[in-house]
Amino acid sequence: MKTEDDEMEYEASKEETVSEDKDFDDGIDYRTVIKENIFTMWYKTSLHGEFATLNCVITPKDQNLLQHIFDEDIQTSEAPQTVVLQGAAGIGKTTLLKKAVLEWADGNLYQQFTHVFYLNGKEISQVKEKSFAQLISKHWPSSEGPIEQVLSKPSSLLFIIDSFDELDFSFEEPQFALCKDWTQISPVSFLISSLLRKVMLPESYLLVATRSTAWKRLVPLLQKPQRVKLSGLSKNARMDYIHHLLKDKAWATSAIYSLRMNWRLFHMCHVCHMCQMICAVLKGQVEKGGRVEETCKTSTALFTYYICSLFPRIPVGCVTLPNETLLRSLCKAAVEGIWTMKHVLYQQNLRKHELTREDILLFLDAKVLQQDTEYENCYMFTHLHVQEFFAALFYLLRENLEEQDYPSEPFENLYLLLESNHIHDPHLEQMKCFLFGLLNKDRVRQLEETFNLTISMEVREELLACLEGLEKDDSSLSQLRFQDLLHCIYETQDQEFITQALMYFQKIIVRVDEEPQLRIYSFCLKHCHTLKTMRLTARADLKNMLDTAEMCLEGAAVQVIHYWQDLFSVLHTNESLIEMDLYESRLDESLMKILNEELSHPKCKLQKLIFRAVDFLNGCQDFTFLASNKKVTHLDLKETDLGVNGLKTLCEALKCKGCKLRVLRLASCDLNVARCQKLSNALQTNRSLVFLNLSLNNLSNDGVKSLCEVLENPNSSLERLALASCGLTKAGCKVLSSALTKSKRLTHLCLSDNVLEDEGIKLLSHTLKHPQCTLQSLVLRSCSFTPIGSEHLSTALLHNRSLVHLDLGQNKLADNGVKLLCHSLQQPHCNLQELELMSCVLTSKACGDLASVLVNNSNLWSLDLGHNILDDAGLNILCDALRNPNCHVQRLGLENCGLTPGCCQDLLGILSNNKSVIQMNLMKNALDHESIKNLCKVLRSPTCKMEFLALDKKEILKKKIKKFLVDVRINNPHLVIGPECPNTESGCWWNYF
């Protein structure tokens, strides 16, 4: 179809149909033509042996879906004008759309539309310029009358755009360049963009089909789209279909289990003809004496068998083999298409990659490529996964890599490929897996024998170098990327490579939801010998893994337990592993038993164990390993119900001399008075524990009383105690105050979020005056006291010589309360070093008193005034003090202090002239672009002493600001700018506990 011919034809028809007054029929002729075209196309397809597949994907569920996609929304009472039909390659989108057109033509569907127009992305991409009327009139019969009259009533029209993902358009046209006139000849890309954006024919309806990978490119063009996903065969339907294809029920059950153990292959089976292909490969391998489980172990193994079967090595009647140059050209076309998400090879693509018609015929005969049945100058790989396989092979067949300083094309950059993940770059994921799988020596040997060539393995060393670089890039070490990476590394089935690949990773984050993931992680992680920290979320217990009859094969349960044993064996085989976090895991009796055995192993070197928010099934909590494991010093059970058995085994372990726990975190563990008393009894004989966090438990005054008995014990080793939000009141402060004077070791106490009031603060203040009080840090955040409490604390500070950290945040001290405190803080013998006054209802009036403290207290090095409305005037007062050479404050918190661009000069003064302030928090202030720009001009100087500056994440990510921050990072690399301070346990220094 040539553009020039179409234009001539259109001009001729235009002269014949100038009258808009002509009466024409209800579109029966057009409906007939449309039906004939679709049936002709289906007939051509059936000649290629694919007619069964076309019918297979049309299920009653899909037909029901078609009937309701334009129904009114129940809440808005509006019918969607734009619907997107989304699904994987080969799932049946095109078939479903053509079925919809046929149903309309037969009068069974969408009768609210007088005309339905079907537009295919493959065809549209080959057209350069036309009017929209020309574009849709290819099959318009003359008996219908002028198409212009039809287009004049857009609210009764439905436009179906098939294969949006194949449209080779950028869709970056500015709004003013779009076209409203459907008679105007324009670039076809402009026409389609205008239609999608509702500039042309805005009242019309759209039904757009696309692969999932193109959704992000499509959605910005649409107005209020409704998305409908085609899911293909369900899990049960897949299993039934595999049974049907393999006939032999016993063998089919084994195949299903093997396929389900490889979630990639099992997922591929949701597309009918992929399921057929996979089962055909399994049949072929079994007939040759192969084992189903070995063929299914990796997706690369199965596809290598399949690709090699397309080029049989027989002397008579064999398919002509492509030479290495031809194979490389095909692979390059494949990889370029995968990266750009373009899966149709047009004439220009063939010329670009130097593929002749004879070359194409070779791959057509081998069933690697197929010719489009409608558009004869379009070629595609027989399936997306076949294209992905050849795309991966490209990286093994590249030549002259040493002559390139930089990759000439983005798709040649292996580092970019490894950086990708299945959420943001789903189109690259399977190709990446195939690439790693092709490092396997058996796969390479198969391909070398099939294609009679030698494959270089230089890419192996390239990948290892990229993995090393990936580990050094902190932004790449997300759970998402690492899990993707493990799936890829597993494909190699090469223990030596896996060991080399994982030697760069000291910290990993993985999640196990299903048995296939467990198999992969258990295989890979035991080869990660440099691993120091492992965060594992185990959500799949044994019962859930064996949830179907097909899975319950003989020995399956034993195999699953073996995988868990393999995974947790790293606790004793990896001597560098010192921390394990089982955050949000579900642990049953079997897993708890395995864990206990591994943690009790004499070679276990683990020091820190975290069971945060863990769900122990059927009360299987068991911490008996603590009695014999002398290495574990840190146990965190936050947000985990200890249960009866958990508390019992924990208390028994704490009583044992072999238990060496130093840190125990039991925040939000559903502890009450009775449980607290049992814990306190166990602690009476414990000599190792130095940190205990019991926050967010309803201990009340009685529970705290039993803890005070522990503190009064001269043999107690407790140094830090956190009792935030434990129901403590002023009545409990009396017994606590008494214990504080008798405790010889306690240095840190957190009582935040308890209603102590002024009376409770008075009792604690009396204790602070006592010479025997050893407290160094006291956290009284949100304890409901007033300036009266401040006065008590102020008096205590005049006598106390040990306290260096005081947190009074979220109490209504007001300016008067702070004034009382400042009187004591300015005294030369006051040893306080860190003062937290967040959300204390302070104003600029308090800044004068605070400024005096900054000048007169040489010990104070950290002051947090966040969430107080100090305004620019308050900062101005503080800045005068900060410029004083006697001021030694290093850390200054000014988050949400009502600062505006008017304070910019004062901030610049702090950054330029103050030599002590090295950390500052400016988040949640109304600093504009110009203010941050000016700050960056000072921060970029290598002489700037600032080490950390906290700014809002949304500000940091703004394009206008980003370039200034990059400049700062280049010129002043020791400075960190971000919303969180690095290298601190809590993540932010202003959050102490």
UniProtKB/Swiss-Prot annotation:
May be involved in inflammation and spermatogenesis. It is found in: Cytoplasm. It comes from the Eukaryota. Its main location: cytoplasm. Detected in adult ovary and testis. Detected in oocytes and in germ cell elements in seminiferous tubules in adult testis (at protein level). SUPFAM superfamilies: P-loop containing nucleoside triphosphate hydrolases (SSF52540), RNI-like (SSF52047). Residues 81-403 form the NACHT domain. GO terms for molecular function: ATP binding. GO terms for cellular component: cytoplasm. InterPro entries: Leu-rich_rpt, LRR_dom_sf, NACHT_NTPase, NLRP_HD2, NLRP_innate_immun_reg, NOD1/2_WH, P-loop_NTPase. Keywords: ATP-binding, Cytoplasm, Developmental protein, Differentiation, Leucine-rich repeat, Nucleotide-binding, Repeat, Spermatogenesis. ATP binds at residues 87-94. One of its GO terms (biological process) is spermatogenesis. The keyword Nucleotide-binding applies. LRR repeats lie at residues 636-657, 660-680, 688-708, 717-738, 745-765, 774-795, 802-822, 831-852, 859-879. Pfam families: LRR_6 (PF13516), NACHT (PF05729), NLRC4_HD2 (PF17776), NOD2_WH (PF17779). This is NACHT, LRR and PYD domains-containing protein 14. Belongs to the NLRP family. It comes from Mus musculus (Mouse). PROSITE patterns: NACHT.
